[in-house]
Amino acid sequence: MGARASVLSGGKLDKWEKIRLRPGGKKKYRLKHIVWASRELERYALNPGLLETSEGCKQIIGQLQPAIQTGTEELRSLYNTVATLYCVHKGIDVKDTKEALEKMEEEQNKSKKKAQQAAADTGNNSQVSQNYPIVQNLQGQMVHQAISPRTLNAWVKVIEEKAFSPEVIPMFSALSEGATPQDLNTMLNTVGGHQAAMQMLKETINEEAAEWDRLHPVHAGPIAPGQMREPRGSDIAGTTSTLQEQIAWMTSNPPIPVGEIYKRWIIVGLNKIVRMYSPVSILDIRQGPKEPFRDYVDRFYKTLRAEQASQDVKNWMTETLLVQNANPDCKTILKALGPQATLEEMMTACQGVGGPSHKARVLAEAMSQATNSVTTAMMQRGNFKGPRKIIKCFNCGKEGHIAKNCRAPRKKGCWRCGKEGHQLKDCTERQANFLGRIWPSHKGRPGNFLQSRPEPTAPPAESFGFGEEITPSQKQEQKDKELYPLTSLKSLFGNDPLSQ
């Protein structure tokens, strides 16, 4: 880390740490941002040592700038960091990243005007391509530098690790900046596997070449002396043209950018391959119930990059589907933010969704709702007994304990009626009859008991055998009539054992 952090020192380091990441924000640049930028440059096969000078930063910006429109957020962050570092090296005072980008744009406009003025002074109104790998040597001739093994190695690693995921396209665009058709074919030939994808790419290139030939027919007649022939589709693809012809077309007046044209054809084919390797539609990207919002956004934008649509359509997809396909928890939060919320605000608001604390809160709310629903259902069915009955002591009459645990002196007599001679279990006060009704004590015994027992007032008449003989059955019937009036319950219970 020490070598990477030594890019700035002294006063430059102080200026660096005073620049804010965003206008009005609290966070400022630190050494860790330079270390991160160095590692990212190594990923893109660029020399991290270029960060030590303003000219090196300018070269890095020239390589990254063409891929900004189609690049990832990491690529844009890297570009912003290098632009800010360039301003620090040049001694330009800036307060934040936005101001550094504006200063950088002003510098580029000034350099373009100077180049145009110099070309006008020399009588050459055309801008000669100075892009790598076509450079101008000391003699003023345009020569070609072969693509470096380091660049090829970076391209092969991307294919091996990412296959043909959407991020392969901006990586290819960055690595092939200013390349000739021969260099582009070298990059494609280094891909060992995925031959089915390579065959699809060849078919797309052939289709684009045929379309070029249809739109640019060959002029009849011989070619004028000192004039170059016009490139055909196969010439642009590098199959029927030499390296010298390709350089001549790219540096002629006016130039024919055969390298850029061929590069566009390859990107069209790569888009088809990416769509084949990523068959998931953006409409199918939905956030799982426990998936963090950050992972959902990553999957969404990765699939969105593979979609073959205009930028306006992609913007509409982002504004609509990103919120619509979120899970219910995040969707509630995102709708509360409003339609003008930025992606940063969305990710900050949904940061805790799906975590342990959020799960506990959701579970507590669900349990509370379930308890309330069960209570409501019980009350509607009439099964709700309400609060439990308060325990009351029979001995002292106080609440909160039972007579077995009572410390007061033992009450004498029955705990129900207060009379002595029997206990509570034998008390006949307020006993229910067979109908479940309480028979008041002042009305005598309950209705299912014999109300009164007839007591004889005179001895029974002796039978001397005179008159009709009374049979035992007749005696029993007569006895029943005396004991049981018409309102008796004998019909229900038979003979009352108390009467025998």
Curated annotation (Swiss-Prot):
Short name of one Pfam family:
Gag_p6
User: Where are the annotated segments for Interaction with host CALM1?
Assistant: 8-43
Q: Where are the zinc fingers (CCHC-type)?
A: 391-408, 412-429
Query: What residue spans carry the region label Interaction with host AP3D1?
Result: 12-19
Q: Where is the lipid attached (N-myristoyl glycine)?
A: 2
Q: Name one GO molecular function term.
A: structural molecule activity
Location of region: Interaction with membrane phosphatidylinositol 4,5-bisphosphate and RNA:
14-33
Q: Name a single GO biological process.
A: viral translational frameshifting
Which sequence positions carry the modification called Phosphoserine?
Answer: 148
Q: Which InterPro entries match?
A: Gag_p24_C, Gag_p6, Lentvrl_matrix_N, Matrix_HIV/RSV_N, Primate_lentivir_Gag_pol-like, Retrov_capsid_C, Retrov_capsid_N, Retrovr_matrix
> Where in the chain is the site Cleavage?
132-133, 363-364, 378-379, 433-434, 449-450
Region span, Disordered: 102-128, 438-500
Remaining remarks: HIV-1 lineages are divided in three main groups, M (for Major), O (for Outlier), and N (for New, or Non-M, Non-O). The vast majority of strains found worldwide belong to the group M. Group O seems to be endemic to and largely confined to Cameroon and neighboring countries in West Central Africa, where these viruses represent a small minority of HIV-1 strains. The group N is represented by a limited number of isolates from Cameroonian persons. The group M is further subdivided in 9 clades or subtypes (A to D, F to H, J and K).
Question: Which comment does the entry carry about domains?
Answer: Late-budding domains (L domains) are short sequence motifs essential for viral particle budding. They recruit proteins of the host ESCRT machinery (Endosomal Sorting Complex Required for Transport) or ESCRT-associated proteins. p6-gag contains two L domains: a PTAP/PSAP motif, which interacts with the UEV domain of TSG101 and a LYPX(n)L motif which interacts with PDCD6IP/AIP1.
Name of the protein in question: Gag polyprotein
